[in-house]
Design a protein with these regions (language model features):
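N-terminal positioning helix adjacent to the helix-turn-helix/winged-helix DNA-binding module
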Residues: 1, 5-8, 86, 134
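Helix-turn-helix
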Residues: 4, 8-46, 50
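Solvent-exposed, amphipathic alpha-helical segments
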Residues: 8-15, 62, 89, 93, ...
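Residues in soluble alpha-helical coiled-coils and helical-bundle/repeat scaffolds
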Residues: 42-46, 50, 98, 102, ...
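Hydrophobic/aromatic residues within well-ordered alpha-helical segments
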Residues: 44, 51, 55-59, 86, ...
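Hydrophobic alpha-helical connector segments
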Residues: 46, 50, 60-88, 134-138, ...
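Amphipathic alpha-helical segments used for helix-helix packing
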Residues: 81-105, 111
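Hydrophobic/aromatic-rich alpha-helical bundle segments in the mid-to-C-terminal region
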Residues: 104-108, 124-175
Length: 175
């Protein structure tokens, strides 16, 4: 039931944005009663924050599995991690948290956990090829590119990536 609520919350964030997401709609999409939803998540903030954290954990696990399977890592890992509908669900949360004190308070600890997970995962994936600062720069650059991609079409986005990735890779990796 918890997983259904988390998935429904992400679906709502993607489809309706944070302001259009309601706990009633999440419960409806999850196929659970409002009481069951409240038992697991007493507030909208707690539910959407848990949903985004769940997404981050899933995505990091996928990246670590790919690394364990021998897939070579490049800075494209950051672009892939911070793009698409799932990233935009998290972005909805950040934007709403800017002006919503309760959500802001809920998102701050999440951001700390996400940053720790990214740093830990980046160290595993890149080893000595990237310093912690290079990982941080890469995260910030990938997030910025993902936001600006909202205003580019797929073709221009791919062209931009093709031009920037080799330069970015050379700047942040040690070999």
């Amino acid at each position: 039931m918890r997983a259904r609520l988390l998935d429904a919350a992400i679906s709502c964030l993607i489809d309706k944005g944070y302001s259009g997401t309601s706990t009633q709609e999440i419960s409806r999409r999850a196929g659970v009663s409002r009481g069951a939803q409240l038992h697991h998540f007493p507030t909208k903030e707690s539910l959407v924050v848990a949903a985004v954290e769940h997404l981050v954990e899933q995505r990091l696990a996928e990246l670590l599995e790919a690394h364990a399977a021998g897939q070579d890592a490049s800075v494209e890992v950051f672009l892939d991690a911070f793009s698409g509908p799932l990233f935009y669900a998290a972005l909805e949360l950040w934007i709403a948290a800017r002006t919503d004190p309760a959500l802001h308070a809920a998102v701050l600890p999440l951001e700390a956990r996400v940053n720790e997970a990214i740093n830990t995962g980046g160290a595993v994936i890149f080893g000595d090829r990237m310093t912690p600062e290079a990982i941080e720069i890469s995260v910030e650059l990938a997030r910025g590119l993902a936001v600006s991609a909202l205003f580019r079409n797929d073709k221009s986005d791919q062209e931009l990536r093709k031009r920037l990735v080799p330069i970015w890779e050379a700047m942040v990796t040690t070999r």
